[in-house]
Amino acid sequence: MEIKYFLVLLVGFLLVLPSIVNPYRKGVTITNQQPKINIYQLDVNNPHNPNNNPHNPHNPNNNPHHPHHLHHHHHHHHHHHHHHHHHHHHHHHHHHPHHPHHHPHHHHHPHHHHHHHHHHHHHHHHHHHHHHHHHHHHHHHHHHHHHHHHHHHHPHHHPHPHPHPHPHPHLHPNPHPHPHPHPHPHPHPHHHPNPNPHPHPHPHPHHHHHHQEASECLSYQGNRNRLFIKRDY
């Protein structure tokens, strides 16, 4: 009787022995897959699940260089979670300039790409709008400044910006521009047919021009100063 019990125990032990010696046959295989189910397969629509996204480079089925092990999957999931967390905190300040290089694989997830692109677009639009608005405002201010400058001076100025600097060395239409160099001296030449209403310092060349070229002076009108400046030589 003892031998029979021993044989029964021996046969039972031999039946159980393969699962003890080779634990990968049964239980560990199930426990091996358990973390994948916990991480990815609870949410079948999760785009971060590499099994749900055939274009995901993190899917070991699509990426032959991708390590197949649980540590990486868990790290990958943690990385994504961290990225999302990082995304909300960090993206507004830092992520945008490094967008193409920061997480190169993420735009392979359609859902994540949509979210990332939308968020990036929003951020980019906001940043770009702010930057563009600032730049446009600055540029407009600059442009307005120049434009305003020309508008303010040109109605009082001669129509051409060059004749005004020339009369100083040539002593021509404005012999006294120093007290009021911009607004006041220039309306006078417009009102007088003679472009030099104050010929005190240089009367002879002026009269010479006036007598010989009065018709040209009147016909050129806006270019009177330029004409007389050229004729001075």
From Swiss-Prot:
It comes from the Eukaryota. Residues 45-64 have a biased composition (Low complexity). It is found in: Secreted. Residues 65-211 have a biased composition (Basic residues). Residues 1-23 form the signal peptide. The keyword Signal applies. One of its GO terms (cellular component) is extracellular region. Keywords: Secreted, Signal. Residues 42-217 are annotated as: Disordered. This is Uncharacterized histidine-rich protein DDB_G0274557.
